[in-house]
């Protein structure tokens, strides 16, 4: 089994930080985390008993009735520890209120499916349940499907987490290893450098994982035979299907089957028109895949990968999980050689007379790497 890598990050500072959060304060936080940093390996190796009895459930902190649905396969090899400033609290009542505010921010401002982390540790020394052990968080793009995301919150501005919080995080990490949620083998921890860094990045690096793809056999594809694709493709075309969308895996599998039937039975195509489809559940569904031509964009189908978001996105864009999944798929395609290194990313409307992918989605992809109007 691959070793897991512990990554300290300051992601989340962008959302809740302020201009007074400077390098000196970040350094103070970094120094305060060194105790945790230096003792995690000793804790897990000694197998010390842990106490997570102070975990506050979602119900107890008043979580909004939303939720992410993408399963996380455990044990994972990576643990990402975040620090979320700007939510000072020192008792369960206030920390629960701050966590509700954070969840609302992630859902309503960031278009997330829930609070971004698997678990959070308040400055009151309690562990707060996020999305839990078995669901992917949306905390670190490119790593959500291979990592657990833990976060400190409630810390007074410019201060490191309290001794109670550090102890709670130690116990949480040790518990994760002992219960099989986190791999027991690991390398020397890495301090990840974010927008506002906690410590300098060391030489060790971690490659992003290619996202998991729901294969045709799982969503119930009809057997077909279509022209082969010559790779690498020169274009990535972003599309929307129009019509209804889906938010949970069962709905998305049904929708993909319906789209395939529409292409085959109504449009007389040899198969579903896209190489891959992205659901609002944050999952990627295999269309015709990497090696077969799609049929959504005549004149480009033999030189382009068609990636479609299921739904209509003229006014409201896809949620954060769906957008991240698509970006990870594109990055994976380039790394694996399915896209040329100098590929061009375009909207469907750039190469065909159509409103797809919708203005709201188009506005977002126009900021992505390799975009060409």
UniProtKB/Swiss-Prot annotation:
Q: What SUPFAM superfamilies does the record point to? A: N-acetylmuramoyl-L-alanine amidase-like
- In terms of superkingdom, the source organism counts as Eukaryota
Q: In which tissues is it expressed?
A: Detected in skin epidermis, eccrine sweat glands and ducts, mucous cells in the submandibular salivary gland, mucous cells in the throat, ciliary body epithelial cells of the eye, small intestine, colon, stomach and in mature epithelial cells of the tongue (at protein level). High expression in skin and esophagus. Expressed also to a much lesser extent in the tonsils and thymus.
Q: What is its main location?
A: secreted
Q: Where is this region: Interaction with murein?
A: 293-302, 353-354
One matching Pfam family is Amidase_2
Instruction: Enumerate the residues binding peptidoglycan.
Output: 263, 274
In alphabetical order, the GO MF annotations are: N-acetylmuramoyl-L-alanine amidase activity; peptidoglycan binding; peptidoglycan immune receptor activity; protein heterodimerization activity; zinc ion binding
This entry's comment on induction and repression of expression is: Up-regulated by exposure to Gram-positive and Gram-negative bacteria.
Which residues, renumbered to this chain, are glycosylated? 22, 39, 109, 145, 247
Which is one Gene Ontology cellular component term of this protein?
extracellular region
Q: Does the keyword Glycoprotein apply?
A: yes
Task: Tell me where in this chain the N-acetylmuramoyl-L-alanine amidase domain is found.
Answer: 74-212, 235-358
Annotated function: Pattern receptor that binds to murein peptidoglycans (PGN) of Gram-positive bacteria. Has bactericidal activity towards Gram-positive bacteria. May kill Gram-positive bacteria by interfering with peptidoglycan biosynthesis. Also binds to Gram-negative bacteria, and has bacteriostatic activity towards Gram-negative bacteria. Plays a role in innate immunity.
Name of this protein:
Peptidoglycan recognition protein 4
Q: Output the lineage of the source organism.
A: Eukaryota, Metazoa, Chordata, Craniata, Vertebrata
What is the name of the gene encoding this protein? PGLYRP4
